[in-house]
C-alpha cells in the first residue's frame, strides 16, 4: 500500500491498483483502476518504492505498472494500458520488452 499526502488528506492506494504514473512540471498524477490522484511530488521520490513491484520508467514523464500493459506497439514506441497510450523512450524500448517478457514468465510459472 502506498500512502500519499495531498493537502489535508492522506490517500492509501493499493500498489496493484496503480495503472501508471505521470509527471508534468511539479504535479505527479497516479492513475489507478479506481480513480486519479494528483499532488505535488517528483517521480524519483516514488519510483524507488515501486520498482520492486514490477514498475518501469519507460519515459522521463511516465512510470508504468508492467502487469497492467495490454499491448506494446514497437514500431511507434507506445505502450497501451486500459485504452491509454503512453510514450516509451526509444532508448528504453528494448529494456521494456525484456522486462515485460520477464514479468510474463513470472506470471505463467
What feature does the model see in each segment?
Residues 1-8, 90-109:
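Eukaryotic intrinsically disordered, low-complexity regulatory linkers and tails enriched in Ser/Thr/Pro
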Residues 38, 55, 88-90, 95:
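Intrinsically disordered, low-complexity sequence elements enriched in Ser/Thr/Gly/Pro
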Residues 1-81:
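Conserved binding/recognition cores within well-folded domains
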Residues 82-87:
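Short, conserved aromatic-histidine micro-motifs
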Amino acid at each position: 500500500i502506498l500512502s500519499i499526502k495531498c493537502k489535508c488528506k492522506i490517500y492509501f492506494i493499493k500498489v496493484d491498483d496503480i495503472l501508471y504514473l505521470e509527471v508534468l512540471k511539479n504535479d505527479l498524477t497516479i492513475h489507478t483502476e479506481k480513480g486519479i490522484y494528483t499532488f505535488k511530488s517528483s517521480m524519483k521520490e516514488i519510483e524507488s518504492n515501486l520498482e520492486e513491484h514490477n514498475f518501469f520508467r519507460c519515459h522521463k514523464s511516465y512510470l508504468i505498472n508492467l502487469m497492467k500493459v495490454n499491448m506494446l506497439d514497437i514500431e511507434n514506441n507506445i505502450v497501451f494500458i486500459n485504452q491509454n497510450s503512453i510514450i516509451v523512450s526509444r532508448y528504453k524500448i528494448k529494456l521494456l520488452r525484456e522486462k515485460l517478457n520477464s514479468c510474463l514468465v513470472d506470471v505463467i510459472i
